[in-house]
Every structure is written in structure tokens, then in C-alpha cells.
Amino acid sequence: MNKPFLILLIALIAFSGCNMRKYFKPAKHQIKGEAYFPNHLQESIVSSNRYGAILKNGAVIGDKGLTQLRIGKNFNYESSFLNESQGFFILAQDCLNKIDKKTSKSRAAKTEETELKLKGVEAEVQDKVCHQVELISNNPNASQQSIVIPLETFALSASVKGNLLAVVLADNSANLYDITSQKLLFSEKGSPSTTINSLMAMPIFMDTVVVFPMLDGRLLVVDYVHGNPTPIRNIVISSDKFFNNITYLIVDGNNMIASTGKRILSVVSGQEFNYDGDIVDLLYDKGTLYVLTLDGQILQMDKSLRELNSVKLPFASLNTIVLNNNKLYSLEKRGYVIEVDLNDFDSYNVYKTPTIGSFKFFSSNRLDKGVFYDKNRVYYDRYYLDYNDFKPKLYPHAAEFKTSQKGEKGNAPIYLQERHKAKENKQPLEENKVKPRNSGFEEEEVKTRRPEPTKDQNNAIQQGETKNNESKNTPISKENAAKKEAPKPSSKEEKRRLKEEKKKAKAEQRAREFEQRAREHQERDEKELEERRKALEMNKK
């Protein structure tokens, strides 16, 4: 085969393979209007995590907006914002970056002796590379504005309670420090993890324990009240090799929800529930969980991870979850704002994000700059949108606009639309049942068995027939006409009904599984209590 032709063929195959990738692109009639990011920041975002973002000028954005913290440029170390906890801004600092090697070389004579000395100095500096956590008080009148605690390696997440600092380090170790004495009270290292998700959860202090979100897909529970800090439980969520760190962790009373990129774990009063999927982000609010998935779904779940509602946007790459005014908002990476009404999860609105002046908001039609969001705002590069004041520019056809249904063009199963209609009518879907009729043979048998009517009976029958004829001649009422003209269910309606029945059966099955798991947990707890009681009796003897 001709070599140039072979190269051209390979190039065409590769190019066609790249073009096969599909992106979220709603039809024009589905786009309700334009959503602007009208507010400006002084500088653009250079780095962000789940709890904050750093701007180019060193300003820090937290979960309540712009803070008074400013991270100055220092040639001896780099700082990263981790979290704001218990009145402290927590910064992770790495002293690796600026070794004064060039100036030493320029000042020293280029002799073998000075080069050997320089190498010795460099080796000594490398041995003394420092990592530390700095706690900066957010109270300007505090007696001690800054506390620095040296670490063995770089800190990835941290939180404070009272005089204790809980830190998860890059070597997958959980550490507990006394802030006043800077003494290490507890440390336990897990298996190393080479790649992690940037959405790193922070440790959470409870009444008697602290929960560490580890990099290897597990939760380490440490008792810090009764004597020396002691690990009391390991909860394994996922065992994947890559990107397996805990990305989300929240405690709500007796309930706890944690997640990696592949699995969600919910602990409800001691009972565990799991959900597996490609998880982008999630948000827990007032007993309900909202999940973004890699395939463009927005899921609504209860605490037992039972799916309540869902919206599917084909090929959408979703980012950020903001709940405001009973609506859910999410950014789509190709330049759209998605709006879902929490009262009507069967539909959604799409708003396009336009170009702002000479600055193209989404370069190459892709959200590829720094992003951060809090309870009410979404920050992108140097702009932000406050959903408390969300005023999109509606297109002229918006007055006649129908919110995009989940069943349109394969967006989601059609039966969910019928489910919504059933909610409105407050009546379950029912199949029109036709009453069984007797066959002609059965009618003849009945006639033969009937006794012949007497004369009086014949008169009564004739009068009844005349009345029936009169009633037939009278005009038919609207209700009776509607009943007679009621069409038979179509094949589509029948399919919807069957799907609804399947979903109902599935929900009942989940409820039975829930009860079964609850019984198993109860039996296990009773068994453990019995074993402990026997052990105590043996010890007494």
C-alpha cells in the first residue's frame, strides 16, 4: 500500500474519532434567555478548592464572600488556603520553592572547592525543607494573630476545634496537634495515593470523635476525649487506585454522608447505604442530597440514597450546585446555566452565557478557568453571579416558552412526564377495563332456562320497553357522552403505565431491602451486646 495514502488514512481515522465526541447542545427553542455574570472581582481566580479560592492579588474568597485575608508574596514559601474554621484562616505553606542557588553561584568563584561547598549547602537546604500550617485569626483584636505549626509534609485539609488541629497530609496521614504547645498528639499513615481529586473534604470534629477524610477512600474515626487519641473505626467507602480521596463529608445529627468520585456512603442512625456512579459533585441540604454525575444527570435523593427525582441533560458536563429560591442552578462547561425547579423536577430551563465586551466569557466555548461557588454565588475567573439577584435576559419567545421536558429527544424516560401529570391529577394511571361479555351460546342457554312470562308480566315488560325507548330518544348528557367517547389507551400510554408500575415495584423492593438491612443491623448489634455482656461476666469470675 502507498505510504502517503496509509498516513492519510490513519489521520482521517484519528480525526473522525475526535469528532465523534459529543457535547451538550440544546436546541434554540430550549434556550430561554441569557444569564450574565454582572459582578466583577479585582483579579482572576488562580486556585480554588471546596472551601475557598485565591485571587491573583492574594485576596481570598470564602464561603461568605470576599474575606479580609490577603496572602502576600513571599520568596521563601508558597501558601495555599485550606479552610476557615473556628475563627482561624488555615493556610498550608510549602518552603520548597525559592533556594538562593543562582545568587550563591554568581557570587562564588567557579572553582572546584567552591562548587563542592555549594553542593554541600544545597544538600543541607534540601534536608531542611519545611512544611507548615499557619493559623491566622479572623479577629483583628485577637492577642495572637498567627500560629505556625511545622509539619512533615504538605497539608491538604485541616480543621480546628478548641485547642486541637486535625490535619490530613499529602502522605495520607491523619494527624492531631495541640495548637498551644504545637505537640503532635496522634498520627496514623495509610497507603500512599499518587493522584487525588482537588475537591478535598476537611476533617470533622464531633462530640467525642474526629472523622478524618483519607486519600485512600476511607474514613478514619478517632476518639480524642477518652485518654490518648485512639482510632476506633475505619469506614471503607471505595478501594479504587486513582482519584479515590474523600471529596465530600458532612455530619447532620446522627446522619453522615461521605463520597469519593465513585461511591456515596450514607450512615443513618448506624445503618449504612451506598450509591455507585461517576460522581462529579454533591450537596446535602435539609435532609435531601443533590448529585451531579459524569453523564449529565442531576439526581435528588433522600438520606437512604433512594432516588426521588432526576434530570438528564445528554452529554452535559455539569459543575457547581447552588440552591436558591427553591431552584437548583448548575453551570454547564459549554457555556450554559441550568435551572431546575425543585417543585417540578420533571423540567428545566437553559440560559446561555454570552460574551462580555471584548472578553469571551467561555473561551473556545468551554469553561476552563478558575471556578468556585458558595451557598448563593458562582465565581468564574474574575466575574461572579449572585443568584439572590438572578435576572436573566429573556428571549422574545420566552412568553410562550415551555420548560424542557425530561422526555424530549431522549433527555430522560417519558414515563416521568406522565408521573408528573398523575401528581397533578392526584389519580393513579389506570387501564380502561372492558367488562367481560357473555358469549352468544351462554345467552341462548339463559333464554331457554327462563320461564315464559305471564300476561301481567308481558304488559310490564312492554311498558318497560317503551320507557327504555323514550330514554334512548332523550338527549345524552355530557357526562355519559364523555364516558362513551373515552378513547382506549394507546400503546404509548400503556408503556408509560407499565414503566410506572415497574418503578413502583422497584421502590417497594428498596423499602423491603431497607427493612431487611435494619433487621440485620439490629440483630448484629444485639449479638455484639450479648458477647460483650458474656465477656464482662467472664472477667468478673
Swiss-Prot record:
Plasminogen bound to PgbB is capable of being converted to functionally active plasmin. GO terms for cellular component: cell surface. Its main location: other. It is found in: Cell surface. It comes from Helicobacter pylori (strain J99 / ATCC 700824) (Campylobacter pylori J99). SUPFAM superfamilies: Quinoprotein alcohol dehydrogenase-like. Residues 420-434, 446-455, 480-541 have a biased composition (Basic and acidic residues). InterPro entries: PGBA_C, Quinoprotein_ADH-like_sf, WD40/YVTN_repeat-like_dom_sf. Residues 420-541 are annotated as: Disordered. It holds the Pfam family PGBA_C. This is Plasminogen-binding protein PgbB. Residues 456-476 have a biased composition (Polar residues). Binds plasminogen, specifically, and in a concentration and lysine-dependent manner. Plasminogen is the precursor of plasmin, a serine protease that cleaves fibrin, fibronectin, laminin and vitronectin. Acquisition of plasminogen/plasmin could enable H.pylori to degrade host components.
